[in-house]
Amino acid sequence: MATLRVLPEAQAKVDVFREDLCTKTENLLGSYFPKKISELDAFLKEPDLNEANLSNLKAPLDIPVPDPVKEKEKEERRKQQEKEDKDEKKKGEDEDKGPPCGPVGCNEKIVVLLQRVKPEIKDVIEKLNLVTTWLQLQIPRIEDGNNFGVAVQEKVFELMTALHTKLEGFHTQISKYFSERGDAVTKAAKQPHVGDYRQLVHELDEAEYRDIRLMVMEIRNAYAVLYDIILKNFEKLKKPRGETKGMIY
Protein backbone atom coordinates (compact mmCIF):
# COMPACT_ATOMS: atom_id res chain seq x y z
CA MET A 1 0.00 0.00 0.00
CA ALA A 2 1.40 3.38 -1.05
CA THR A 3 2.03 5.79 1.78
CA LEU A 4 3.28 9.35 1.94
CA ARG A 5 5.87 10.09 4.59
CA VAL A 6 5.23 13.43 6.29
CA LEU A 7 7.74 14.91 8.68
CA PRO A 8 6.32 15.34 12.20
CA GLU A 9 7.23 19.04 12.30
CA ALA A 10 5.48 19.60 8.96
CA GLN A 11 2.34 17.81 10.16
CA ALA A 12 2.46 19.88 13.35
CA LYS A 13 2.40 23.09 11.30
CA VAL A 14 -0.61 21.87 9.33
CA ASP A 15 -2.39 20.91 12.55
CA VAL A 16 -1.76 24.39 13.99
CA PHE A 17 -3.18 25.93 10.81
CA ARG A 18 -6.29 23.74 11.00
CA GLU A 19 -6.86 24.54 14.66
CA ASP A 20 -6.44 28.26 14.00
CA LEU A 21 -8.85 28.05 11.06
CA CYS A 22 -11.44 26.23 13.17
CA THR A 23 -11.14 28.85 15.91
CA LYS A 24 -11.56 31.70 13.41
CA THR A 25 -14.58 30.02 11.81
CA GLU A 26 -16.28 29.45 15.16
CA ASN A 27 -15.63 33.09 16.10
CA LEU A 28 -17.18 34.21 12.80
CA LEU A 29 -20.28 32.14 13.45
CA GLY A 30 -20.50 33.01 17.11
CA SER A 31 -20.19 36.78 16.88
CA TYR A 32 -19.01 38.29 13.59
CA PHE A 33 -21.75 37.03 11.26
CA PRO A 34 -24.61 38.09 13.57
CA LYS A 35 -22.96 41.51 13.96
CA LYS A 36 -22.64 42.00 10.19
CA ILE A 37 -26.24 40.91 9.62
CA SER A 38 -27.38 43.58 12.07
CA GLU A 39 -25.07 46.28 10.65
CA LEU A 40 -26.06 45.68 7.03
CA ASP A 41 -29.74 45.54 7.95
CA ALA A 42 -29.34 48.95 9.60
CA PHE A 43 -27.50 50.24 6.51
CA LEU A 44 -30.45 49.21 4.34
CA LYS A 45 -32.74 51.34 6.51
CA GLU A 46 -30.62 54.49 6.20
CA PRO A 47 -32.03 57.40 4.16
CA ASP A 48 -29.07 57.16 1.75
CA LEU A 49 -30.39 53.82 0.49
CA ASN A 50 -34.07 54.73 0.57
CA GLU A 51 -34.33 57.66 -1.81
CA ALA A 52 -37.96 57.67 -2.96
CA ASN A 53 -37.47 60.32 -5.65
CA LEU A 54 -34.64 59.05 -7.84
CA SER A 55 -34.50 62.36 -9.71
CA ASN A 56 -32.67 63.67 -6.64
CA LEU A 57 -29.74 61.52 -7.69
CA LYS A 58 -29.12 63.60 -10.81
CA ALA A 59 -25.57 64.85 -11.11
CA PRO A 60 -24.96 68.11 -13.03
CA LEU A 61 -23.65 67.65 -16.56
CA ASP A 62 -21.47 70.62 -17.45
CA ILE A 63 -22.06 70.19 -21.16
CA PRO A 64 -23.38 73.34 -22.86
CA VAL A 65 -26.12 73.02 -25.47
CA PRO A 66 -24.85 74.63 -28.69
CA ASP A 67 -26.68 77.35 -30.59
CA PRO A 68 -28.25 75.68 -33.68
CA VAL A 69 -27.43 78.60 -36.01
CA LYS A 70 -23.81 78.79 -34.94
CA GLU A 71 -23.49 75.04 -35.14
CA LYS A 72 -24.84 75.04 -38.68
CA GLU A 73 -22.32 77.67 -39.72
CA LYS A 74 -19.55 75.75 -38.00
CA GLU A 75 -20.57 72.54 -39.78
CA GLU A 76 -20.56 74.28 -43.16
CA ARG A 77 -17.07 75.64 -42.50
CA ARG A 78 -15.90 72.18 -41.45
CA LYS A 79 -17.25 70.57 -44.63
CA GLN A 80 -15.57 73.24 -46.73
CA GLN A 81 -12.31 72.67 -44.91
CA GLU A 82 -12.54 68.92 -45.50
CA LYS A 83 -12.90 69.50 -49.23
CA GLU A 84 -9.85 71.70 -49.30
CA ASP A 85 -7.82 69.58 -46.94
CA LYS A 86 -6.61 66.36 -48.56
CA ASP A 87 -4.29 65.44 -45.73
CA GLU A 88 -5.89 62.33 -44.22
CA LYS A 89 -3.59 62.44 -41.23
CA LYS A 90 -4.70 65.91 -40.29
CA LYS A 91 -8.33 64.90 -40.66
CA GLY A 92 -7.75 61.98 -38.32
CA GLU A 93 -6.17 64.28 -35.76
CA ASP A 94 -9.11 66.67 -35.96
CA GLU A 95 -11.55 63.83 -35.32
CA ASP A 96 -9.62 62.78 -32.22
CA LYS A 97 -9.92 66.16 -30.56
CA GLY A 98 -11.93 66.22 -27.36
CA PRO A 99 -15.37 67.82 -27.04
CA PRO A 100 -15.53 71.60 -26.45
CA CYS A 101 -16.51 71.43 -22.76
CA GLY A 102 -14.86 71.18 -19.37
CA PRO A 103 -14.32 68.02 -17.34
CA VAL A 104 -17.45 66.10 -16.36
CA GLY A 105 -17.28 64.56 -12.90
CA CYS A 106 -18.73 61.36 -11.50
CA ASN A 107 -22.03 61.22 -9.65
CA GLU A 108 -20.76 61.96 -6.14
CA LYS A 109 -23.79 60.41 -4.43
CA ILE A 110 -23.17 57.11 -6.20
CA VAL A 111 -19.42 57.25 -5.55
CA VAL A 112 -19.94 57.85 -1.82
CA LEU A 113 -22.24 54.82 -1.58
CA LEU A 114 -19.81 52.64 -3.52
CA GLN A 115 -17.00 53.67 -1.18
CA ARG A 116 -19.04 52.12 1.62
CA VAL A 117 -20.17 49.05 -0.29
CA LYS A 118 -16.87 47.95 -1.88
CA PRO A 119 -15.17 47.18 1.47
CA GLU A 120 -18.24 45.14 2.42
CA ILE A 121 -17.92 43.11 -0.79
CA LYS A 122 -14.23 42.48 -0.12
CA ASP A 123 -14.94 41.51 3.49
CA VAL A 124 -17.74 39.04 2.79
CA ILE A 125 -15.73 37.32 0.03
CA GLU A 126 -12.73 36.91 2.34
CA LYS A 127 -14.89 35.53 5.14
CA LEU A 128 -16.65 33.19 2.72
CA ASN A 129 -13.29 31.90 1.48
CA LEU A 130 -12.21 31.23 5.06
CA VAL A 131 -15.37 29.31 5.92
CA THR A 132 -15.19 27.38 2.64
CA THR A 133 -11.63 26.31 3.40
CA TRP A 134 -12.71 25.24 6.88
CA LEU A 135 -15.49 23.12 5.39
CA GLN A 136 -13.17 21.48 2.87
CA LEU A 137 -10.78 20.53 5.65
CA GLN A 138 -13.61 18.72 7.44
CA ILE A 139 -14.15 16.34 4.52
CA PRO A 140 -13.17 12.83 5.66
CA ARG A 141 -11.19 10.22 3.80
CA ILE A 142 -13.13 8.67 0.93
CA GLU A 143 -14.56 5.29 1.91
CA ASP A 144 -17.75 3.27 1.51
CA GLY A 145 -20.74 3.66 3.80
CA ASN A 146 -21.95 6.26 6.28
CA ASN A 147 -21.67 9.11 3.77
CA PHE A 148 -24.82 11.05 4.64
CA GLY A 149 -22.78 13.65 6.52
CA VAL A 150 -20.44 13.96 3.54
CA ALA A 151 -23.46 14.60 1.31
CA VAL A 152 -24.47 17.42 3.65
CA GLN A 153 -20.98 18.88 3.37
CA GLU A 154 -21.18 18.74 -0.42
CA LYS A 155 -24.56 20.50 -0.48
CA VAL A 156 -23.28 23.29 1.76
CA PHE A 157 -20.13 23.58 -0.36
CA GLU A 158 -22.28 23.98 -3.50
CA LEU A 159 -24.18 26.78 -1.78
CA MET A 160 -20.93 28.51 -0.82
CA THR A 161 -19.64 28.26 -4.39
CA ALA A 162 -22.83 29.84 -5.74
CA LEU A 163 -22.59 32.66 -3.19
CA HIS A 164 -18.96 33.28 -4.09
CA THR A 165 -19.77 33.53 -7.80
CA LYS A 166 -22.58 36.00 -7.14
CA LEU A 167 -20.50 38.19 -4.82
CA GLU A 168 -17.49 38.22 -7.16
CA GLY A 169 -19.79 39.51 -9.90
CA PHE A 170 -20.36 42.72 -7.95
CA HIS A 171 -16.84 43.95 -8.79
CA THR A 172 -17.50 43.50 -12.50
CA GLN A 173 -20.89 45.15 -12.14
CA ILE A 174 -19.37 48.27 -10.56
CA SER A 175 -16.65 48.54 -13.23
CA LYS A 176 -19.27 48.12 -15.96
CA TYR A 177 -21.30 51.00 -14.51
CA PHE A 178 -18.38 53.44 -14.74
CA SER A 179 -17.49 52.23 -18.23
CA GLU A 180 -21.05 52.62 -19.54
CA ARG A 181 -21.50 55.99 -17.82
CA GLY A 182 -18.23 57.22 -19.30
CA ASP A 183 -19.39 56.19 -22.77
CA ALA A 184 -22.73 57.95 -22.24
CA VAL A 185 -21.03 61.15 -21.05
CA THR A 186 -18.71 61.06 -24.07
CA LYS A 187 -21.66 60.74 -26.44
CA ALA A 188 -23.51 63.55 -24.65
CA ALA A 189 -20.43 65.78 -24.97
CA LYS A 190 -19.87 64.99 -28.65
CA GLN A 191 -23.57 65.42 -29.51
CA PRO A 192 -24.87 67.86 -26.88
CA HIS A 193 -28.00 68.60 -28.89
CA VAL A 194 -29.22 64.99 -28.41
CA GLY A 195 -31.19 64.94 -25.16
CA ASP A 196 -31.33 61.14 -25.06
CA TYR A 197 -27.62 60.88 -24.29
CA ARG A 198 -27.98 63.26 -21.35
CA GLN A 199 -30.94 61.28 -20.07
CA LEU A 200 -28.98 58.05 -20.52
CA VAL A 201 -26.39 59.28 -18.01
CA HIS A 202 -29.11 59.89 -15.42
CA GLU A 203 -30.75 56.53 -16.16
CA LEU A 204 -27.45 54.75 -15.56
CA ASP A 205 -27.06 56.55 -12.22
CA GLU A 206 -30.55 55.52 -11.14
CA ALA A 207 -29.96 51.91 -12.19
CA GLU A 208 -26.67 51.79 -10.27
CA TYR A 209 -28.37 53.21 -7.18
CA ARG A 210 -30.91 50.39 -7.28
CA ASP A 211 -28.11 47.88 -7.85
CA ILE A 212 -26.17 49.21 -4.85
CA ARG A 213 -29.15 48.61 -2.60
CA LEU A 214 -29.49 45.09 -4.00
CA MET A 215 -25.77 44.47 -3.41
CA VAL A 216 -26.12 45.40 0.26
CA MET A 217 -29.14 43.12 0.54
CA GLU A 218 -27.26 40.24 -1.09
CA ILE A 219 -24.26 40.69 1.22
CA ARG A 220 -26.52 40.72 4.27
CA ASN A 221 -28.36 37.67 2.97
CA ALA A 222 -25.07 35.86 2.32
CA TYR A 223 -24.07 36.28 5.96
CA ALA A 224 -27.53 35.21 7.11
CA VAL A 225 -27.70 32.12 4.90
CA LEU A 226 -24.18 31.01 5.82
CA TYR A 227 -24.88 31.50 9.51
CA ASP A 228 -28.17 29.63 9.33
CA ILE A 229 -27.14 26.61 7.30
CA ILE A 230 -23.85 26.06 9.15
CA LEU A 231 -25.50 26.44 12.54
CA LYS A 232 -28.25 23.97 11.64
CA ASN A 233 -25.79 21.39 10.31
CA PHE A 234 -22.73 22.15 12.41
CA GLU A 235 -22.32 18.64 13.85
CA LYS A 236 -22.70 16.99 10.44
CA LEU A 237 -20.29 19.46 8.86
CA LYS A 238 -17.65 19.10 11.55
CA LYS A 239 -18.03 15.35 12.13
CA PRO A 240 -19.75 13.90 9.04
CA ARG A 241 -19.25 10.33 10.24
CA GLY A 242 -19.69 11.00 13.91
CA GLU A 243 -15.96 11.26 14.56
CA THR A 244 -13.02 13.31 13.36
CA LYS A 245 -11.40 11.91 10.24
CA GLY A 246 -8.29 12.86 8.36
CA MET A 247 -8.20 15.35 5.54
CA ILE A 248 -9.03 14.24 2.03
CA TYR A 249 -6.05 16.19 0.74
Curated annotation (Swiss-Prot):
Keywords: Proteasome
Single GO cellular component term: nucleoplasm
Native organism taxonomy: Eukaryota, Metazoa, Chordata, Craniata, Vertebrata
Organism: Bos taurus (Bovine)
A GO MF term: endopeptidase activator activity
Biased composition (Basic and acidic residues): 68-98
Role this protein plays: Implicated in immunoproteasome assembly and required for efficient antigen processing. The PA28 activator complex enhances the generation of class I binding peptides by altering the cleavage pattern of the proteasome.
Gene expressing this chain: PSME1
Location of region: Disordered: 55-102
GO biological process annotation, one example: regulation of proteasomal protein catabolic process
Subunit architecture: Heterodimer of PSME1 and PSME2, which forms a hexameric ring. PSME1 can form homoheptamers.
Entry-linked InterPro entries: PA28_C, PA28_C_sf, PA28_N_sf, Proteasome_activ_PA28, Proteasome_activ_PA28_N, Proteasome_activ_sf
Keyword Disulfide bond: no
Entry similarity comment: Belongs to the PA28 family.
Annotated protein name in UniProt: Proteasome activator complex subunit 1
